[in-house]
């Protein structure tokens, strides 16, 4: 129906997935903010997605200096902000989750997780650079507390070679 088509066409994640799955190829899409934080200067955003327990919201505003914050109701986001000035942008996130669950052969167990995110982007004459750092840890009562560290580097620029007009390079590393 028309309403379903309209909902899908305005949803960034679904739109990017249908176009190849990588927001880096579509410079004018707001999902680029997560790969290249300096692109936040191209957008003023007030988005609310959903009206249930899984609602998400994004707010980004300002002219020469950008301020913003993001909310995702499926985690206890203590801090998830955006700030940018001139040719650079910064995203900072600090999220926690906790849960109580019952195992079939044990008493109630409690587990909690902590996720810290930092992303920096710079636009220059060379083009756009994005760096992402993410650390995640889980604490439970079993003594085996998994953790991980992730590093990402993204580069996008005009690079006319043969029939190609642009270049997008992404490097991601994750340890656990």
Residue spans of the language-model regions?
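Transmembrane beta-strands of outer-membrane beta-barrel pores
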Residues: 50-54, 71-75, 94-100, 124, ...
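N-terminal, post-signal peptide beta-strand-biased segments of exported outer-membrane/organellar beta-barrel
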Residues: 9-74
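Short, conserved acidic/polar surface loops in the N-terminal third of protein domains
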Residues: 78-80, 100-105
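Feature captures outer-membrane beta-barrel proteins of Gram-negative bacteria and organelles
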Residues: 34-40, 54-70, 77-92, 112-131, ...
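Long, internal scaffold/assembly segments composed of regular secondary structure
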Residues: 144-176
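Intrinsically disordered, low-complexity regions
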Residues: 13-16, 45, 56, 98-101, ...
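Bacterial N-terminal signal peptides
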Residues: 1-7
């Amino acid at each position: 129906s028309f309403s379903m088509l309209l909902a899908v066409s305005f949803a960034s994640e679904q739109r990017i997935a249908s176009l190849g799955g990588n927001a880096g190829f579509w410079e004018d899409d707001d999902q680029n903010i997560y790969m290249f934080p300096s692109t936040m200067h191209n957008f003023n955003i007030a988005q609310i997605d959903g009206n249930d327990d899984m609602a998400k919201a994004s707010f980004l505003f300002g002219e020469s200096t950008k301020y913003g914050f993001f909310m995702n109701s499926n985690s206890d986001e203590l801090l998830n902000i955006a700030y940018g000035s001139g040719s650079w942008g910064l995203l900072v996130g600090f999220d926690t989750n906790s849960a109580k669950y019952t195992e079939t052969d044990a008493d109630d167990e409690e587990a909690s997780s902590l996720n810290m995110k930092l992303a920096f982007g710079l636009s220059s004459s060379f083009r756009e650079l994005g760096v992402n750092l993410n650390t995640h840890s889980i604490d439970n009562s079993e003594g085996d507390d998994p953790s991980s560290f992730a590093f990402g580097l993204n580069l996008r620029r005009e690079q006319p070679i043969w029939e190609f007009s642009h270049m997008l390079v992404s490097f991601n590393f994750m340890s656990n």
